[in-house]
Amino acid sequence: MNGLRKLSLMAAMLVCTTWAAVAQKPNIHILATGGTIAGTGASATKTNYTAGQVAISTLLEAVPEVNKIANVTGEQIVKIGSQDMNDAVWLTLAKRINELFSRGDVDGIVITHGTDTMEETAFFLNLTVKSDKPVVLVGAMRPSTAMSADGPLNLYNAVVTAAARESRGKGVVIAMNGLILGAHGAMKTNTVDVQTFQSPNSGALGYVLNGKVFYNMESLKRHTTGSDFDVAHLDKLPKVGIVYSYSNVEADIMTPFLNDGYQGIVHAGVGNGNIHQNLFPMLEKARQQGILVVRSSRVPTGPTTLDAEVDDNKYQFVASQELNPQKARVLLMLALTKTKDWKKIQEYFNVY
């Protein structure tokens, strides 16, 4: 009997130890949206593929090591290439993340996402998630069937980042190819290279190495719990478009922006957000119609500054500061849910 009691006691202790280990690991939930990380190709050596084909359960099976660092669960939100990302999916993601964090039993979120518009989704969530818990976007430049696919290690590093206590309060981040990049500054810089995501204006926040995160800095821009924007009761976003400037641009490219219900226009200008003489009268007309105009630049680095070659105060234009056109569009959409005062919107661009 004594032997049986000892065996029972040992078994009970083993069960308790196992449950304690599970309980001590953070709970990480993965929201899958598709993209190259879930893509399949006809050949392991070719770059052509179909995005968004692999389910999240299959992706996790390829990286069993994540279960050693976290209790990982997942759900499929959509299965799309991120070139088809849209406002409806953004709103779904933001609301779902806020719902998960409100429950109290989720410690971090990982979002698998295509790289084409990842920086836009990350920035949108950076402004609409209402928690200081980690939200990490991750993708791949090579499909899951490719020789030397980058997705599995990227996914592992993303879970490591989301599970780390040090990641709290950093805002929404992108974890790609070993780097941890803040949503404000991250951008895709190469069409095919695995080291495509960089933060050329500010640098990476940190990196992941051997299953550990190392942070060197954090963003001073407002985000997440410090954000003014709330999408809880929104089912759509204001209509905002981007008009691209180039040599000999014709004024008629502005016609749809003036006639099709746009509430805001981001001008992707040359140099420091400069505007071609053919477009200037059309942008003035937009302001007269109550359409907000933000000046950004097609140049990948450097800010678009107030009152450089354009008198923004005179024309009531907003300068995007360090935000590229696609991110300026995101902030303008959210700003328009709060106000149409161009001066207040300029304040938003100064701090976000």
Question: Which positions does each model-derived feature cover?
Answer:
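Bacterial Sec-dependent N-terminal signal peptides
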Residues: M1-Q24
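Accessory alpha-helical/coil subdomains and C-terminal extensions
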Residues: K25, L31, A55, L59-V66, ...
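A glycine- and small-aliphatic-rich helix-loop capping segment at beta-alpha/alpha-beta transitions
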Residues: A44-Q53, T117, F123-V136, G151-N157, ...
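C-terminal non-catalytic interaction/assembly regions of soluble proteins
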Residues: N272-Y352
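Short Gly/Thr/Asp-enriched flexible loops that form oxyanion-binding sites at enzyme active sites
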Residues: I111-K133, I275-E284
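Internal gly/pro-rich beta-alpha loop/helix module
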Residues: V138-L209
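Short, acidic/small-residue loops that bind anionic groups at enzyme active sites
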Residues: A122-L153, V159-A163, Q288-S297
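ATP/NTP phosphate-donor binding region
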Residues: A23-N98, P281
